[in-house]
């Protein structure tokens, strides 16, 4: 009889006091105390060096409990933002505590643009705001991994100071299509840039003793029906594009955790996809960390036992029924206890790294001033100058008063919606940003727009459009429709203002994709506003600047000819207005570059034909008798295959509004002395950058590689490396060194399930964008191959786009 059984028996005997002699009762109680003390002393307490001992001491029920989240408050339909209340109000979730073995609960908080927790708590006079850092698209546009790491460090510090252990980010899905509602959280259409920026972010966070959860693994390319849609993709496109960024991050930064996505990949849910979570992630890449589900609980068509077997270590947000299911599956033989033990070991290895395990004394008082400075710097370096006809920068106090048009000049969008939104202590809008730079703005326009915004907020609350109210009001800032401004009003502003700014805002986020007519394109009121303001101010010889305050790409080709300058400010965090003013006044020279192609029209992307919103749901279902699977909703075919973003536009010679890697500066740069050296598998590219202009600035050198014709069709060229100079003074030069491995140039050979770099002459193109190549050097490479798991093949035929279909 074990100690637990002995204690249970003695406790039972002690309850039947009517039949036990008093002396016997005292003896039994003493024995109970002795056995309790013995049992407690025999139980191991978790340490970093006794994980196997603790695992052996755990009961099956405790093991199952540790694999299931803390069952926090969340909407029963799943697929929403979590709502932890017990430890850190507003955090997304927790892991289970097992006190007898010294296993603490850990706290998971949403991100990745800052710590997402409730700013107000019942019974507390303190506020718990968090710094709103620039969104992913803005951060990546810096192309500055050192700066991104600093942002990560600040986020890691706030994560710890608010008693959290893991921030649920970075978001690493590709910008397959500009209509995806969650693109603002993600970095790029290119996997190399995605992986490098993510690795820097992860290094920064984890250097502070907090963890990350790189998400959403994998092929989460749309928000529409994201919890069920089947993303059908070739093995090659999956390996080269949708998985490659994760692979880079895993190999270079070793994230504590990875979050499996809601969607299916080739017919199997990612959360229960052994091909993804074990064969590729662990066997091919060597990942040793913990994998968690996205927030959904029990779902139809996927058992918790199958998730455990596939390699999912933590089911979030957690439901008691999932614990019971794991226990039952082990007992009835449908789940191997070895799978459970393997996952529990990974959970324990994660827990011993956390601030909660180390009893970190959280202050609830982050260094907001220091983090605001980092936010301002990273936003300023991530804002892209798209056009400049000599209107910027404003010099010598030439601009004293500005007419600010557009409702988002006054209701500035610092970030997106959903789990990616943050509750900051403040947001610097355009009015405040200009004021801090010593520039006045129109009081008349301020009164018009602030009164309109107050009205629009009341109207929005009254109407409560179901999808948008949930998305915006509960989990982010609403974007209100633009209003018309009369020509009389505009002409009155011309009389008193030295320049005009028109801010065009767009909001998007979790759970909803964007439409073309009103969210990608400008609505008629916005088109008219830009045209009327430009005509009026230009007639008086005064400049007009357009500020794009959007997390995602918008249409520009139809109106970009009107303004004198265009700045893509993205959603740059709480310091946005200050960052924009720094650029307008020339305090900082723009150095950002686009991380995605800006097409002339949304339909120019080949993926748009297989993207939700391009299909009339009701007409399709009626024609098919409500029985057929709906393309773009029930499934999405990645027929464009490897031709995503610039890989398509450059290979097929399609016109674009702004190419990948594009961004202007107030100075000019010369590229010289290009060189490439091959030493075994290591390839080193050198380029010297000289500032040939009149002001200091930074430049980003991008290395694209064009492969020789071979057995595997490839895009015309692909980004394989990049580097950013320090700030160069006029006339100053810097030689950049960019290294890559021969494997980095490989394509995925599906027939042989291997990576292959074919032998031949490779062109290393060094440029300022994918369409502005400044120097080219060639090198001959020998063949390279690497076998990997033959998994993740599509179950349905895809109509793959090839060069022969140009």
Regions from the language model: what does each represent?
Residues 1-45:
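Bacterial Sec-dependent N-terminal signal peptides
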Residues 30, 499-500, 779:
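Small side chains
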Residues 753:
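Extracellular/periplasmic metallocenter environments
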Residues 772-788:
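Short beta-strand elements
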């Amino acid at each position: 009889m074990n100690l637990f059984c002995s204690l249970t028996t003695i406790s039972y005997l002690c309850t039947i006091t009517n039949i036990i002699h008093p002396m016997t009762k005292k003896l039994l109680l003493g024995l109970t105390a002795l056995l309790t003390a013995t049992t407690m002393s025999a139980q191991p307490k978790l340490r970093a060096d006794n994980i196997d001992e603790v695992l052996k001491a755990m009961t099956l029920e405790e093991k199952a409990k540790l694999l299931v989240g803390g069952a926090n408050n969340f909407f029963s339909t799943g697929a929403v933002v979590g709502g932890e209340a017990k430890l850190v109000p507003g955090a997304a979730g927790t892991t289970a505590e097992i006190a007898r073995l010294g296993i603490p609960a850990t706290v998971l908080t949403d991100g990745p643009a800052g710590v997402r927790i409730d700013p107000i708590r019942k019974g507390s006079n303190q506020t718990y705001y968090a710094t709103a850092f620039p969104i992913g698209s803005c951060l990546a546009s810096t192309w500055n991994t050192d700066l991104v790491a600093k942002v990560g460090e600040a986020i890691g510090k706030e994560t710890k100071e608010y008693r959290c252990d893991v921030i649920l980010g970075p978001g690493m899905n590709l910008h397959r299509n500009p209509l995806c509602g969650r693109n603002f959280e993600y970095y790029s259409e290119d996997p190399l840039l995605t992986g490098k920026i993510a690795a820097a972010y992860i290094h920064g966070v984890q250097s502070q003793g907090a963890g990350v959860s790189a998400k959403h693994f994998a092929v989460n390319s749309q928000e529409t029906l994201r919890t069920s849609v089947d993303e059908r993709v070739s093995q090659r496109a999956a390996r080269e594009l949708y998985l490659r960024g994760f692979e880079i991050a895993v190999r270079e930064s070793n994230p504590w955790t990875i979050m499996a996505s809601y969607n299916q990949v080739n017919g199997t849910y990612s959360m229960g996809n052994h091909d993804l979570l074990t064969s590729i992630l662990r066997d091919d890449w060597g990942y040793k960390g913990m994998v968690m589900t996205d927030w959904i609980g029990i779902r139809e068509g996927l058992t918790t036992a199958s998730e455990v077997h596939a390699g999912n270590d933590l089911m979030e947000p957690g439901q008691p029924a999932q614990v019971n299911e794991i226990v039952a599956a082990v007992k009835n033989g449908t789940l191997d206890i070895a799978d459970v033990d393997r996952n529990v070991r990974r959970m324990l290895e994660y827990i011993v790294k956390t601030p909660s395990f180390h009893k970190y004394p959280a202050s609830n008082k982050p260094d907001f001033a220091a983090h605001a400075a980092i936010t301002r710097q990273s936003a300023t370096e991530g804002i892209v100058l798209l056009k400049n006809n000599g209107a910027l920068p404003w010099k010598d106090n030439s601009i004293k008063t500005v007419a600010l048009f557009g409702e988002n000049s006054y209701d500035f969008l610092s970030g997106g919606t959903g789990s990616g939104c943050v509750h900051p202590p403040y947001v610097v809008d355009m009015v405040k940003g200009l004021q801090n730079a010593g520039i006045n703005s129109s009081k008349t326009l301020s009164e018009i727009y602030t009164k309109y915004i107050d009205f629009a907020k009341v109207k929005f609350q009254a109407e409560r459009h179901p999808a948008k109210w949930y998305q915006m009001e509960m989990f982010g800032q609403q974007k209100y429709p633009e209003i018309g401004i009369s020509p009389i009003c505009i002409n009155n502003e011309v009389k008193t203002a030295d320049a005009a700014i028109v801010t065009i805002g767009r909001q998007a986020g979790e759970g909803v994709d964007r439409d073309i007519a009103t969210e990608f394109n400008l609505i008629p009121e916005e088109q008219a506003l830009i045209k009327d303001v430009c005509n009026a101010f230009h007639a008086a010889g005064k400049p007009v600047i357009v500020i794009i305050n959007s997390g995602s790409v918008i249409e520009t080709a139809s109106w970009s000819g009107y303004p004198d300058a265009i700045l893509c400010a993205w959603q740059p965090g709480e310091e946005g207005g200050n960052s924009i003013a720094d650029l307008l006044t020339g305090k900082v020279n723009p150095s950002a570059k686009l991380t995605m192609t800006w097409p002339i029209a949304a339909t120019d992307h080949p993926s748009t034909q297989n993207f939700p919103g391009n299909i009339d749901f009701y007409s399709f279902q009626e024609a098919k008798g409500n029985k057929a699977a709906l393309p773009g909703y029930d499934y999405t075919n990645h027929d464009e295959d490897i031709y995503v973003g610039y890989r398509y536009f450059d290979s097929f010679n399609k016109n674009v509004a702004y190419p990948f890697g594009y961004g202007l500066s107030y100075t000019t740069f010369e590229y010289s002395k290009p060189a490439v050296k091959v030493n075994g598998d290591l390839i080193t590219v050198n380029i010297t950058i000289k500032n040939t202009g009149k002001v200091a600035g930074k430049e980003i050198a991008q290395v694209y590689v064009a492969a020789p014709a071979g057995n595997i069709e490839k895009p015309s060229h692909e980004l394989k490396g990049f580097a950013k100079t320090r700030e160069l003074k006029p006339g100053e030069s810097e030689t950049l060194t960019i290294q890559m491995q021969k494997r980095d140039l490989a394509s995925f050979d599906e027939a042989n399930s291997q990576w292959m770099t074919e032998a031949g002459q490779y062109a290393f193109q060094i440029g300022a964008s994918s369409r502005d190549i400044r120097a080219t050097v060639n090198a001959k490479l020998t063949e390279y191959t690497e076998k990997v798991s033959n998994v993740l093949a599509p179950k349905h035929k895809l109509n793959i786009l090839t060069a022969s279909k140009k």
